[in-house]
């Protein structure tokens, strides 16, 4: 009799995805982030579900319901802060995961890469709408500012904004629909993750050398399951330390003030994980131009497979490209810092320079450096 693991129609799928999956023997810890993202998604759905049991999506009671969760619900404070800080962990891992893909040339798996970019957009949309739900000052004004950006779309912009708001301003209708979307999107994301994995398993994983590893594969279980468990353990230690000691470290104090449409906070800014994109948006003095730059700053990821001009897939043996990669990382950190600063000198200039460098590095410097490396290697 054949093993049930290999014959049962459902268990067979799990077996081929997580147990008997042939994996390259040399993938490093940079390949841990995929599984960590999966764990994060599961954690967010679970904590989110329990929060939704006590939350009310109404402008008059939303803020109070979050307070009620933290004060009166058994371990409500823990669930709330795990959910809020879990989102931060999610984005840290997302950025590491994407960075790994760029460094090692994983974007040459075009189907996997493009669905991954769409996943990033879906997660960003979910996080944005989740930030609106507590209905604090930054929730309300963040929602107002970001949704208002759509009014820059020629001809149909203003109508589109009012359609999204469900009225003439961010109000009860907006909060209710944002809650509905925030609840449904993670399940759509889960389906997209399955498609992401389906495409990945068509080709198999990349590896640090960027070479074909068919001649040297090992089973996913037990080698990479145990490695992933270590990653999850380290993640949980980090997350729980954050939740237990400094739960508000990454949040905004303004969000502890209930939403007030008559009082604008001095500095409107999104959560830290959107600051780089926010800095790019702010660095262009034209509304439509800013919105286009913001959109393109994320969608530029889809151009990586087209812009790849090196004869080698990975950056492991390309020191010049490695330098550019780390310049790009430093540039994004500068953008993140600038995004959290007030709009005044010298931050405006720094933001504009960093935004320009971001696009220039990806669109011009990286492809041309790769071509030069080909020449240097006489390829």
Swiss-Prot record:
A ubiquinone binds at residue 201. Heme b b566 binds at residues 97, 196. GO terms for biological process: mitochondrial electron transport, ubiquinol to cytochrome c. Binds 2 heme b groups non-covalently. Keywords: Electron transport, Heme, Iron, Membrane, Metal-binding, Mitochondrion, Mitochondrion inner membrane, Respiratory chain, Transmembrane, Transmembrane helix, Transport, Ubiquinone. Heme b b562 binds at residues 83, 182. PROSITE patterns: CYTB_CTER, CYTB_NTER. InterPro entries: Cyt_b/b6_C, Cyt_b/b6_C_sf, Cyt_b/b6_N, Cytb/b6-like_sf, Cytochrome_b, Cytochrome_b_C_euk/bac, Cytochrome_b_N_euk/bac, Di-haem_cyt_TM. Its main location: mitochondrion. Its cofactor is heme b. CDD domains: cytochrome_b_C (cd00290), Cytochrome_b_N (cd00284). It is a multi-pass membrane protein. It is found in: Mitochondrion inner membrane. GO terms for molecular function: metal ion binding; ubiquinol-cytochrome-c reductase activity. It comes from the Eukaryota. Changing residue 345 to Y: In strain: Isolate NK 13030. One of its GO terms (cellular component) is mitochondrial inner membrane. Gene3D superfamilies: Cytochrome Bc1 Complex, Chain C. The chain crosses the membrane at residues 33-53, 77-98, 113-133, 178-198, 226-246, 288-308, 320-340, 347-367. The cytochrome bc1 complex contains 11 subunits: 3 respiratory subunits (MT-CYB, CYC1 and UQCRFS1), 2 core proteins (UQCRC1 and UQCRC2) and 6 low-molecular weight proteins (UQCRH/QCR6, UQCRB/QCR7, UQCRQ/QCR8, UQCR10/QCR9, UQCR11/QCR10 and a cleavage product of UQCRFS1). This cytochrome bc1 complex then forms a dimer. Belongs to the cytochrome b family. Heme 1 (or BL or b562) is low-potential and absorbs at about 562 nm, and heme 2 (or BH or b566) is high-potential and absorbs at about 566 nm. Component of the ubiquinol-cytochrome c reductase complex (complex III or cytochrome b-c1 complex) that is part of the mitochondrial respiratory chain. The b-c1 complex mediates electron transfer from ubiquinol to cytochrome c. Contributes to the generation of a proton gradient across the mitochondrial membrane that is then used for ATP synthesis. This is Cytochrome b. The lineage of its organism: Eukaryota, Metazoa, Chordata, Craniata, Vertebrata.
